[in-house]
Curated annotation (Swiss-Prot):
Organism for this UniProt entry: Mycobacterium tuberculosis (strain ATCC 25618 / H37Rv)
Family: To C.elegans F20A1.4 and H.influenzae HI_0967.
Listed name of the protein: 30 kDa non-secretory protein 2
Source superkingdom: Bacteria
């Protein structure tokens, strides 16, 4: 589980990859 928290935009992009 690799969860990286950056900025709102960063999180949104990461969430897309996760989901």
């Amino acid at each position: 589980m690799d969860e990286t928290i950056v900025t709102d935009k960063g999180v949104a992009e990461f969430s897309f990859f996760k989901f």
